[in-house]
């Protein structure tokens, strides 16, 4: 009897010692795997960022090269110098491009609608960064045709679309999670901007300030920096290390000039407001008064009017960088500068609302340059000052760029990088910030946030978290999860995990208090790493993770899911530590769309009531 008792005690002690050794071995194995996985994760992150920088940069370079080729072929001055053509041909060149892009829009209306920077932001906010590759291809060729045949728009919007599309395609191809897709989509957009403008710092801040709407994460920043640097190196190698603008010597004046810079900053904000007012007026004209819905009916009449003015002044053609360079070497009188300033504002608004393909960065730079230049000439003529028009033209570029596009930081860095001159950084900062504040004050939001609201997308920079911030966890709690006690044997755990309804097992003690989660991966790893895995019990494998309370918002659960890469989050009563249920990723998605649908329905009903 005593012998049998001693044997049982011995076996029990051996079992406890073995289980403790297994648990320690398993713990060491998990730590080792964690370190190895973290190293692999960071190396993969760097490698993917480099690949996206190379491909997005190559896409931007190819786009830039084809655009320059098309623009040079169809530029009126080049046509007249190479062949003796009738001026009527020049008149119809913009309409030819409009005819082709309108037909493309007619064939693919849904794809054509997702254009420019705004579509990349929307993809990140509501599609988890996913951009179909056919969209990328469409918006590669359409802007080349549109801008190359004279549309006074810029290459940066299409470039961001191309780079973002490449980043999205690569990360989708690699089957990365949604957070990584968002990160690499923004990195691709920033890399393309970096390549097109030879401005890596501006490319990084463009990704942060515009595409991510200032929602910055550390890994997102590193991806943006790596991709932008790689893209810029590639662009400098392929296109040469040259600046977009050739800036002659200029004089900033003394500190008394800062009062005039301040006045110019306010004028830049007013000019930006004028652009938005005109843009809204033209939009109402097309939609409400004329009720033109076809792309042909909107764009071709605009290009015919543009063609008439183009016969009068070739400086209206295309992107306008050469015109800015000519402005800075004093090729324009005051009246010529004012005339081009007014026409560029009007045609930018017209082409955008008519459905042409291109961005607003380059036209903003051109409008700002003419605004600052004209301001200086007017001040010298009527107030007997002696300020330098070139200096004020440079400062005006930053002011209007920041005002029209709501990007104060990016505008400062972009103008600084494309000019390569540090001297005017202080007045540039002043004009960018003040112009931006004028817009925010009078419009109540940035250009992109207002555009999103116009499309009934009331999702701010935090995406689905903001929408669900007022929805409690208790509204989607599940109580039919698989639960095991702490002392449950390993063999029972295997059978339970195989048939687990939500893929995880939740471990509790005898008082029903939550101890941790066991995943299929944990069980599989225990089998691989240990010959004596059968001696393990549930508490040995349970991983203690943060939980939410029933009254917490669903956004809290989302944060935990993102941080720990979970599909399910336990719901625990903090007062007694008891497990009350779980929240699943699928239920969160369903709740999100339910709330969005309810908001859309409410807005529709309100609009209907107001219409009555």
Predicted feature residues:
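Alpha-helical transmembrane segments and immediately membrane-proximal extracytoplasmic
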Residues: 1-470, 474-475, 479-480, 484-493, ...
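Short hydrophobic beta-strand motif reused across regulatory alpha/beta modules
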Residues: 205, 413, 515-523, 580-589
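Bateman (tandem CBS) regulatory domains
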Residues: 456, 469-481, 488, 522, ...
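The conserved cystathionine-beta-synthase
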Residues: 484-501, 508, 527-530, 534, ...
